[in-house]
Each structure stands twice: as structure tokens, then as C-alpha cells.
């Protein structure tokens, strides 16, 4: 039993690209090993609750006659092997989760960079001058949708959903977009310390006021 478990848990998830299915399979294997460990402990419990360390000889040095020595030795051996297997699988699960998380962060960075390049390319192809900010964030509530999206105080807004420098008239434009986008992601482009940042903001009801949890003021143009 333990040799089979060891062979299935061998190998590193980093040998190839890890998928969510791979992680689910590792977790299934971990649970299977835990069930086997529990079953073997139940065998020991059925033998006078002998456990892993109690002696198998009596006070005179003779093999105990009140327990099944073969079952006890086999269960103890299985538990030791399975615990080693469990430790190995837990390490694989940890490595696989780290790899998935790192890959997700890389993909997010690539997507944002690509969106930035597309925006610049679109402006250049249309012969437009660089986008100008039309509003500014001057306060953000902790834990709000705006905070979760990554907005920061003093961010200057270049695009807010369908609102941009060309069509912005008043803050009512932003309010209208927010009201019609509850629960839906909005693409927001801001200028922060001289650099453009692409954010995804989801207007959502939360513990505070409004759907954003931030205050936006218009910029003088």
C-alpha cells in the first residue's frame, strides 16, 4: 500500500506547467493518504488502543498474547510510510499553488501591458494628442471597491469606462456610468506620478456609502 502511495506522490509539479486540475488531483491524493492513515490508526485502536510506541512484549519479555502482533506491526509500518507520503504531497501542493499564483501575476502584468500598448497605438493611429486628465481622486475609503481596484489618492483620471477627456462634461457623466455598471467591471485609466495605469473597477454595494467608496473632483481645463 505504502509503496504504491510513494510512487504516485513522486515527481515535482515544476517539471511541467501546473494546471488547476493538477492541484485538485494532488489534493485528492492528500485526502486519500489521510484516509489511509486514519484507517491504520483505527486498526491500532482496535488492538487494545496500543498506539505507535507501546511495547509488543509483556513484562517478562514474551510477545504479547492479547493483541494481533502482525496487524499492529503492519499498521505501524503503514502509518510511518504514509506520513512520509503525506509530507511529500503537501510539499507538492504548496509548490503547485505558488507556481499557479506566480503565473497568474505574470499574466495580469502582460494583460495590463498589452492594454497600455493598444491604447498608445490607438492614439497614435488616430493622430490624437496624449489623453488629458479630466478628474482627480481626492479620497478613498479603506476596503471600498475603489481601494480594492487599486485606485489611489491623487490619481488623475484619463478614462472612466466610456467617459474620457473628449466627452466629459461634469461628474454626472461618471455617476451615470457607475449607476449603469453596478456589478460590472469598468476599465479605468489613471495617471499616477507621470505613469499611466490601467485598472478594473467594479461598482459594488459595500459597507460604506455609494458604489465606489471614493471621492472624485473635476480638474480645471
Swiss-Prot record:
UniProt domain PDZ: residue ranges: 108-193
A Pfam family matched in the record: Nas2_N
GO-annotated cellular components: cytoplasm; nucleus; proteasome regulatory particle, base subcomplex
GO BP of this protein: proteasome regulatory particle assembly
Compositional bias ranges of the Basic and acidic residues kind: 105-121
Record-linked SUPFAM superfamilies: PDZ domain-like
Coiled coil regions, renumbered to chain: none
Keywords: Chaperone
Residue ranges with Polar residues bias: 1-11
Residue ranges, annotated region (Disordered): 1-22, 105-127
Cystine pairs: none
Functional note: Acts as a chaperone during the assembly of the 26S proteasome, specifically of the base subcomplex of the PA700/19S regulatory complex (RC). During the base subcomplex assembly is part of an intermediate PSMD9:PSMC6:PSMC3 module, also known as modulator trimer complex; PSMD9 is released during the further base assembly process.
Family statement drawn from the similarity comment of this UniProt entry: Belongs to the proteasome subunit p27 family.
Record note on quaternary structure: Interacts with PSMC3. Part of a transient complex (modulator) containing PSMD9, PSMC6 and PSMC3 formed during the assembly of the 26S proteasome.
The protein's name: 26S proteasome non-ATPase regulatory subunit 9
GN (gene name): PSMD9
Amino acid at each position: 500500500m505504502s509503496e504504491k502511495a510513494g510512487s504516485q506522490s513522486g515527481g515535482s509539479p515544476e517539471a511541467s506547467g501546473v494546471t488547476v486540475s493538477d492541484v485538485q488531483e494532488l489534493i485528492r491524493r492528500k485526502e486519500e493518504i489521510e484516509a489511509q492513515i486514519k484507517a491504520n490508526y483505527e486498526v491500532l485502536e482496535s488492538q487494545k488502543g496500543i498506539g505507535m510506541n507501546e511495547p509488543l512484549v509483556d513484562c517478562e519479555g514474551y510477545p504479547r498474547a492479547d493483541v494481533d502482533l502482525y496487524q499492529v506491526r503492519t499498521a505501524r509500518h503503514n502509518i510511518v510510510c504514509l506520513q512520509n507520503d503525506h509530507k511529500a504531497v503537501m510539499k507538492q501542493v504548496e509548490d503547485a499553488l505558488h507556481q499557479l499564483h506566480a503565473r497568474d501575476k505574470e499574466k495580469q502584468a502582460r494583460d495590463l501591458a498589452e492594454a497600455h500598448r493598444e491604447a498608445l497605438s490607438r492614439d497614435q493611429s488616430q493622430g490624437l494628442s496624449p489623453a488629458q486628465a479630466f478628474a482627480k481622486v481626492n479620497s478613498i475609503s479603506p476596503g471600498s471597491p475603489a481601494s480594492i481596484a487599486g485606485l489611489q489618492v491623487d490619481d488623475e483620471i484619463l478614462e472612466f469606462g466610456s467617459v474620457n477627456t473628449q466627452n466629459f462634461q461634469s461628474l454626472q457623466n461618471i455617476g451615470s456610468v457607475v449607476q449603469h455598471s453596478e456589478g460590472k467591471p469598468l476599465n479605468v485609466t489613471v495617471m499616477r506620478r507621470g505613469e499611466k495605469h490601467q485598472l478594473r473597477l467594479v461598482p459594488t454595494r459595500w459597507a460604506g456609502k455609494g458604489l465606489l467608496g471614493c471621492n472624485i473632483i473635476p480638474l480645471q481645463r
